[in-house]
Amino acid sequence: MNKGQYFWNELWCEGRISFHKEEVNPDLIAYVSSLNTPAKGRILVPLCGKSVDMLWLVRQGYHVVGIELVEKAILQFVQEHQITVRENTIGQAKQYFTDNLNLWVTDIFALNSALIEPVDAIYDRAALVALPKKLRPAYVDICLKWLKPGGSILLKTLQYNQEKVQGPPYSVSSEEIALSYQQCAKIELLKSQKRIQEPNDHLFNLGISEVNDYVWCIRKG
């Protein structure tokens, strides 16, 4: 287990998962139509944790594919929502699945790419910003390989003064987004908003006084 894997496993084992939200992300509800995903289309949720957003997408009629490093997160997800799953193990990857939900427990960088059928869209609420800068180019490349031509990514990022605090979540600039997805046909900024300070906000509690949130829709050519 490398340093990054140990870090995330430790957070889940100790229950330090303030990044997990109990409500469906309002930006997903507001902007899911921007993806133009066909009915019953396949949506990838990388680094999915136990996000309730996945259940919401399934209820909208989509087939959801989740990839998560920590098995505890997936087990909590299926238990908390009383989902009856089938199980499978392929190499180092473990699979929990139903007819419209396919959850992989593995390191996304080590997953045999052939195991993931091409997807119509990707929903990234907190995956890119969970990765240090040196890993983000490889992550983007992996996701784009799984995305069908013409498919879209709904991506949430944030910016703050990272000289004061090291992530995760990491600050990702608009310039990095433009560079990372320059091969795509379209990069559209759907939302830019200064975050309102809340008592349980991790970054504000660490002394960051200003955080800006962004929502992007990126279309592959």
From Swiss-Prot:
It is an enzyme of class 2 (transferase). S-adenosyl-L-methionine binds at W12, L47, E68, R125. It is found in: Cytoplasm. Its main location: cytoplasm. One of its GO terms (biological process) is response to metal ion. Its EC number is 2.1.1.67. One of its GO terms (molecular function) is thiopurine S-methyltransferase activity. InterPro entries: SAM-dependent_MTases_sf, Thiopur_S-MeTfrase_Se/Te_detox, Thiopurine_S-MeTrfase, TPMT. Keywords: Cytoplasm, Methyltransferase, S-adenosyl-L-methionine, Transferase. It catalyses: S-adenosyl-L-methionine + a thiopurine = S-adenosyl-L-homocysteine + a thiopurine S-methylether. GO terms for cellular component: cytoplasm. The keyword Flavoprotein does not apply. Belongs to the class I-like SAM-binding methyltransferase superfamily. TPMT family. This is Thiopurine S-methyltransferase. The gene is tpm.
